[in-house]
Amino acid sequence: MSEKSQCVIVGIAGASASGKSLIASTIYNELRAKVGDHQIGVITEDCYYNDQSHLSMEERVKTNYDHPNALDHDLLCEHLEKLMKGESVEVPEYSYTEHTRTENTTTMTPKKVIILEGILLLTDPRLRDLMHATVFMDTPLDICLLRRVKRDVEERGRTMESVLKQYQKTVRPMFMQFIEPSKQYADIIVPRGGKNRIAIDVLKAHIAKLLKA
């Protein structure tokens, strides 16, 4: 994106449990000292899953959460555009146990740097146009699956059986249909997950360059 704005938006995409959150938090923590604690923020695409409060729990669990239609990219684009104009937004809060948004929101004030992370970011041309730099976490799917099982069982109240069933039914097929093809839109492709030190340093240097532009 070439248009001058009040903030730099960096998008980090890739498979579920590929290391997106880890690399986003690492860059966030390491850049705070340079740009200021209140001048960098992270937005997770998961927060923009559709509000399903009108559906029963039985209907909610049937949703294909790995398909672009499960996400409210209209609202995400609207919020990013407002932040770029120097306006604050109310980021939704999503509950993984209730499979819908909660009544709570988090106020996001304008920042110099916004790190956006999510599985389907690069599939939407509107989002790609708003990003100043794009990253794809190219982590092997077997590694992602192991991480996903551990995370969803320990942190999201899931059973191993339900995680594996979802992986076979939607996660892997949607990765092959939507996420993997979106890799072509990445400026930087990161192998070996979120602990890739060289990739982190390259990203930080690129963000610093964008801030000076």
Curated annotation (Swiss-Prot):
Chief place of localization: cytoplasm
Enzyme class of the recorded protein, top EC level: transferase
Recorded metabolic or biological pathway in which this protein acts: Pyrimidine metabolism; CTP biosynthesis via salvage pathway; CTP from cytidine: step 1/3; Pyrimidine metabolism; UMP biosynthesis via salvage pathway; UMP from uridine: step 1/1
Intracellular or extracellular location(s): Cytoplasm
The enzyme's E.C. designation: 2.7.1.48
One Gene Ontology cellular component: cytoplasm
UniProt keyword terms in alphabetical order: ATP-binding, Cytoplasm, Kinase, Nucleotide-binding, Transferase
Gene3D superfamilies on file: P-loop containing nucleotide triphosphate hydrolases
Signal peptide per UniProt: none
GO molecular function: ATP binding; cytidine kinase activity; uridine kinase activity
CDD domains: UMPK
Any GO BP: CTP salvage
Catalytic activity: uridine + ATP = UMP + ADP + H(+); cytidine + ATP = CMP + ADP + H(+)
Binding positions (ATP): G14, A15, S16, A17, S18, G19, K20, S21
Taxonomy, superkingdom: Bacteria
Similarity-based family: Belongs to the uridine kinase family.
Database matches in PANTHER family: URIDINE KINASE
Name of this protein: Uridine kinase
Native species: Vibrio vulnificus (strain YJ016)
